[in-house]
Amino acid sequence: MSETPTDQSPQRMSTRNQARVNYTDMAAGNNSVEKEPVFRSPTASTRGRKKRAANVDVADLSASFGNLNNFSTPPKRGRPRGGGLGSARGGRAPMVRRTTTEESAEVDDRELVAAVKSGKKITEAVDRWIGRYNEKFLVAIAEMHQFFFAICGCKGIVTPQMSATLTYKDIICRMTEDFEEDSADYPLVHGGSLKKVRANLHNFIHTLIIRTKASMLFDSNLMDGFVQLLTGMADSQVRAFRHTATFCAMKITSALVDVTIELTQSKEKTSKQIEAEKAKLKNNSAGNEKYEALVAQRTQTEERAEEIRQIIGYLFRSVFVHRYRDVVPDIRCICIQELGHWMDVYPEHFVEDSYLKYIGWSMFDKVGDVRQRCIRALIPLFEKTLILDKLELFVNKFKDRLVSMLLDKDLETSIETVHLMRVLYTVFPTLLTIKDVVPIYELIYASNRPLAVAAGMFLNTKVFRSAEKPGKAPTAANIPLVKDLTTFFIEGDLHQHATYLVDALFESNPIVKDWATMGELLINDQYQLDSNFETKLIEILTCSVVQSATGEPPVGRHIVKKGAPSAKESRDLVEDRQRLTETLIPLIPRLITKFSSDNEKIINLVNIPLHFQLETYLSARMQTHLMELMEGLDSLIEKHLDEELLKAVAELYYHLTTNSSISALVEGHKMKLLDGVAAFIRKSMQQFDDDQMGEEEEALFVSYIKRMAAFAGFMDLRHWDLWDILLKVVSNYTREDTQRDVRERSMQMLFMQLCFDSMNIKKEGETPKADQVRKLKKRRDQLIRIVTETLNEEACGVEQAYLVICDLMILFGSQLAEESKALEPLIWRPDAMVLGNLKIFLDVNVFDVSNLDDMDQQEKIEVMHKMRQHVAQYAKLIIHGAMPVAEASHLIKRYQSHFQDFGDIFKNLLSKCREISFVETGVMICETLKTLYSQLDEDQGTDPLSESFNSIRDLAKRLGPAFGVDYAKNRFAISSLHKKAIDFAFEEYDKENHQMPKNIFFLEIAIEFSGKLLAQDKMAVVRYLNKIYTNRVGTSTVVWEPYRLYLGSLSDRNDDDNMSVRSGMTVTSNATMRSTASSTRGRGRGRGRSRIADDF
């Protein structure tokens, strides 16, 4: 096997007396912007591939190359010199070449293209090409030219004769003619098997430059040709040429920048050696050959570095300057990304205002990817302290634009801009004003988590730079920082939920996990915190505990992460939970005692123990704190009547008693507490029966009912046997001031007891005992009687009665028969009157409410929450099968009028109905539209041009997507809808008087669903329409316009042609309608005639 070819210049005729291309002079022709002021806004965009200015015309450039041979330049040391190559936009000077018969053969670029497309053996392919260049350099050059065209997707052939005799402009024109239309999806943008071509092409170009940097890189026949060809291709009107050539030119420039850096470092090393040799020569008057060799080596290195810089400058002005505003966004991205790379690796040369201005101008680009690359290019520059003075003018010029990009509509750009602002603040602390950083503070509460985290990192850099790692004891250095954090939350007044602030800082700021310091601030009175400050600090503490224990971000900030947490994340979660447990167990009882009179603070504090590792209470030292916690909870039960607080305490009791490790320590305490509450309720009812209940006793009775109701939602209260007492309360309690509270809480407790009884029956065995079923059925009927009477009479507590009825319909639905035959007697099928009362309640209390505008903001929010709960409760009945899909019509007919308030519920209901039955959903939608149409006819008559009729048509249009995009899957649902529509349109038609059917205009509404039909199903609908028309209309020659419009919508034409408007409609008659049942659609041959939907 032959050895890998070395990088040596081919043995050919010397060209030492021939001048090489002077890139400096060439670039000067294009450097029209150099004389303009720095950062002047660019002139009109050249993205539309306009012609260059006259001073860079291809003919002039070609002429400048044609006379290069007339100049004689002294040869330079150490390498052969080639002839100057012409411009891609003009002629080139004829090169002195050694022609051989072998060089006339056609080139074969398959090896290079295959290597780039596959990404395999790229280095070997480059080495073999270098070997061919050393043997037959003209063929190798043509092969490389062919490669650049082939990688663009062009199938044209470049021969050595073309490469040697034609100008680059002519070669590009010929390749443009050979570029086929089907090659538009060129490799650089192709997906699939070619998705890695971009990375492979970058690797190929980098390898080529590195393997030739010793000598061949400075051969004019090689590099000058590449530069001119790529420059011409980058100016082509063919997008594939322009895109690929720009990519290659920019990657070549990046590789040349790396070579320049290497040469510069070599020169500095040689200079140090020269200084060392100079010191030796002071004591030796004789010559020093090593010194002279070093000087000669430095001179050669300087010359080579200068030549490379000239090529870089020429490529920049001939390609970058024209392509950074190209019409193709990815071309602009390539230019900016590579410019950022040059600035990063070679700031001494590129971090100048003449280059930075292109970054600044591109920050105004309309495409987010381009703006994002501008920001990414700037971030590493501000981390280099030696060049900060060069960035000062740029920052002052474009600071306002950077601040505005904080709110960029492209999220990735906004995130990168926040990171840039953080780095910018680090190096220029006085640059950003308060007005500039306020948008960053607002982003801490953004719904996008990466953006909020980036804003949190900025806040850390600006405020919390000196935070210390928290421990189990308070940290004195963190006390002022915790105060600053709380003050920031209060003064920001941007959001009322601290959980978003905590989440933004959770991973980057240790302050949010310094629970010991927070507790010290709250307990110790020497810090003199005001009440609002304490409330906000407790909220921050609670949110931090919840996220540390669960690892879950707040609602709306879900982490898009696949798979289970890593081992480190799981370990950190366990360690954080253990630390917060040991830190807060002694503090929580003291905090509850201190703030026992403040509802808002106590609710947050009571939630904290839910996230403890309860096994920690088993130690003797911690059991004391558990008893303190129980005593504190008892005091809260005695002091407070707030429903939310009572539920929080009851939940904590339930959480503690259901944990097997400590339940024995807590169960007795809980039983004692509830025994006292139940005993007082019995005593109060006895007073009520004896008519001895005064106002004070009445208030106490209501308070104990509320306390017991809070516990009823979390635990089974059958031990206290309150069923009969609560029934009596609901039936007989009539005191006006407290009747509503008492009746609602009592109904709630009765229902929850039914739930626990039902669950207990299913747990006790496979076949429930008959007496247990009878007892449960008796209780169920008792509760049903009470709540249905309440709903029917609209008595006090009607809202709770509505909720209980809906839940009872689900709890005792038909699914019980599937669980066990013995449970069939428990199934409840409400009669029509009950269902009608549910609809009436919904209309009166939700859809017909008109006084919302008169309420204040908080009251309006509470009322709307309650209304949404009622609508969702009705939707649950359909979703869980307690009512048929057809009953959804009562909600769907409000789809358009109440979409703003209940749209999400309506959409979810439609989706679930479709999952239950496509056909029933189609019929339900048709019934909904029929109901609205009938109401329209009763109110004002049917006018198809009226606003009311158009609103029904718009509703039909909005309900169309409910069927999904799979027409084959929902074909029978759509067909059923059309059948119902046709039947309704010709309903009650009297053929004697030939009057237009009163419902005929309903066909115009059904037109909105014609586009959902398959072609063969349209024929079935047409046949059914003709049959109904013939049977009911008879031989009448009258053809009504709605009929004609509907028939036209069923003809075989594009869906876009099915117009909903009445004007301008050309209807195809039945005789001329084309049959398409046997036509083929899509690719390939037909697979036989599809089964047409049943002819109804």
From Swiss-Prot:
Domain SCD: 320-405
Subunit annotation: Component of the cohesin complex, composed of the smc-1 and smc-3 heterodimer attached via their hinge domain, scc-1 which links them, and scc-3. Interacts with scc-1, smc-1 and tim-1.
Tissue/organ expression: Expressed in gonadal cells.
Ranges where the record places region Disordered: 1-53, 67-106, 1057-1096
SUPFAM superfamilies per the UniProt record, alphabetical: ARM repeat
InterPro entries named among the record's database cross-references: ARM-type_fold, Cohesin_Scc3/SA, HEAT_SCC3-SA, SCD, STAG
Compositionally biased tracts (Polar residues): 1-21, 1060-1073
Recorded GO MF terms: chromatin binding; DNA binding
Gene Ontology biological-process entries: cell division; double-strand break repair involved in meiotic recombination; establishment of mitotic sister chromatid cohesion; meiotic sister chromatid cohesion; mitotic sister chromatid segregation; regulation of DNA damage checkpoint; sister chromatid cohesion
Residue ranges the record marks as coiled coil: 261-312
UniProt subcellular location: Nucleus; Chromosome
Similarity-based family: Belongs to the SCC3 family.
Domain of life: Eukaryota
Cell division keyword on record: yes
Organism: Caenorhabditis elegans
Cited PROSITE patterns: SCD
A Pfam cross-reference name: STAG
Protein name listed in UniProt: Cohesin subunit scc-3
UniProt keywords, alphabetically: Cell cycle, Cell division, Chromosome, Coiled coil, Mitosis, Nucleus
Example of a GO cellular component annotation carried by this entry: cohesin complex
Functional note: Component of the cohesin complex, a complex required for the cohesion of sister chromatids after DNA replication. The cohesin complex apparently forms a large proteinaceous ring within which sister chromatids can be trapped. At anaphase, the scc-1 subunit of the complex is cleaved and dissociates from chromatin, allowing sister chromatids to segregate. The cohesin complex may also play a role in spindle pole assembly during mitosis. Plays an essential role in cell division during embryonic development.
Disruption outcome: RNAi-mediated knockdown results in embryonic lethality. RNAi-mediated knockdown from early in larval development results in sterile, uncoordinated (Unc), and protruding vulva phenotypes, in abnormal embryonic cell nuclei morphology and in defects in the mitotic and meiotic cells of gonads. RNAi-mediated knockdown results in somatic gonad cell division defects with a reduced number of pi uterine cells at the early- to mid-L4 larval stage. RNAi-mediated knockdown results in chromosome segregation defects in early embryos with lagging chromosomes at the anaphase phase of mitosis.
